[in-house]
Amino acid sequence: MCGDRNFKAAAKYELHEMGHLSSHQRGLLMTFVGVLFLTPDALLLRLVDADHWTLMFWRSLIAGCCLFALNGISQKTNPIKAVAELFRNGLFCSLFFAGSNACFVFSITHTVAANTLVILAVMPFIAAVLTLLFMATKLALRTWITIVVAMAGIVVVFWGRFGQGDIGGNIVGDVVAVFCALFMAATLVAIARNPKINTLVAVGVGALLAALFALAMGADPRAPSGEDFIYLAINGGIVIPVAMALITHGPKFISAAEVSLIMLLETVLGPLWVWLVLAEQPGQQTFM
């Protein structure tokens, strides 16, 4: 009994301390937890035996529906009214996320997973530039230093790839990964610029737009097997909704560049899961 009382007292103390976190600390914590949820994303996509359009369709459709369900549970708002409000206040956020979603799936299926995730390290730089252009917000020197280090990783990934006959192969996936970073950075800046955006609805609409785009491009919804649907359900039903709900809430408390820097954790852990499960070893430049 004494041990049970001590446990309850400790739990209450932890909740009390959490309540005293500053808004900046809450933003950092939410983003960090969200990125941890996101790290298996690349692995779950690689485990599905389907073309990229079909992957994009199911991943986006399931995620979009779950994000709307989360919004209904947490916000208790009418989904039709929420979408109507989005058209006045956040449509660009949805379009940017749709582009990021589509580019990520295309890239992860057209190049080594580690390359896609490492190239996404350009996201903090893009977010910083967009923040300066559209929000006139100055970033701390340490943030810029971290961004420069991340950019150096991009140079290492691309180093030696050109001129070696790889132009028509993996390089396409690498280039699309850069556009993925651009769209995701724009999504975060759009939220930071207008914190009143209902991010669950905005990202949910973006996911559904990506699903419609994939269907128009030739997705075959019947292609995945039963086992494939398990991975798709985990990815679209748990990983993406939880991760995006937390990550897209981050820019309401911290800068978009800071959110992008925390997302570099996926660059470290994402390729590790793919390597451990599928033995897909990153290239020498990427591994460095």
What are these regions (language model features)?
Residues 27, 50-99, 126-127, 182-187, ...:
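Transmembrane alpha-helices of multi-pass small-molecule transport proteins
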Residues 5-57, 61, 65, 95, ...:
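Glycine-/small-residue-enriched transmembrane alpha-helix faces in small-molecule transporters
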